[in-house]
Amino acid sequence: MEQRREMLEELLYAWMEMSLHIRGNRILDSFSFNEIMICGLLHRRQVSGQPPLTATELGDYTRLLKSQINHILTGLESRGLIFRERSTHDKRVIYVHLREEALSSYLSEHEKVLDIVDSICTTLGEEDTKQLTALMRKATAVVNNCISKEEL
């Protein structure tokens, strides 16, 4: 039992350490962590040709509160990085778009993150990287399942 407890503590510490490094080291110059997440979701959606996202959908994806999403979107909008567009089919729905002018700034910051990910992949090698990716997805599914059970 003590061995399992130590393993759990080590995993938690490793997770916290990675999270702190990602959030606390100011890797990005032009965006906060949450802003780059929002822009990343908007960019992926635009590139894939899927319909744009709403603020509610962004909140669902990021697990941020509606007030946090609105604060982030207002900031991005005031900097001219996004625009909001009311649906022609349902006036209650407002879509969020990444502006073309914001693309170079976003992609530049995205490249910085990819450089870090590339360093991880180079250090781990292809097989370990694939295994890490699979394990991260599996762990995310477990966390989502635990949270879903708590919400019931």
Regions found by a protein language model. Give the residues of each.
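Hydrophobic recognition helices of helix-based DNA-binding modules
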Residues: 18-22, 42, 106-109, 113, ...
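N-terminal leader segment of winged-helix/HTH proteins
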Residues: 1-34, 40, 79
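Amphipathic alpha-helical interaction segments
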Residues: 10-13, 37, 131-134, 138
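N-terminal helix-turn-helix DNA-binding core of bacterial DNA-binding proteins
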Residues: 23-65
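Basic amphipathic alpha-helical segments that dock to polyanions
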Residues: 39, 58, 73-79
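Charged, amphipathic alpha-helical coiled-coil/dimerization segments
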Residues: 74-130
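C-terminal regulatory/oligomerization modules of transcriptional regulators
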Residues: 1, 127-152
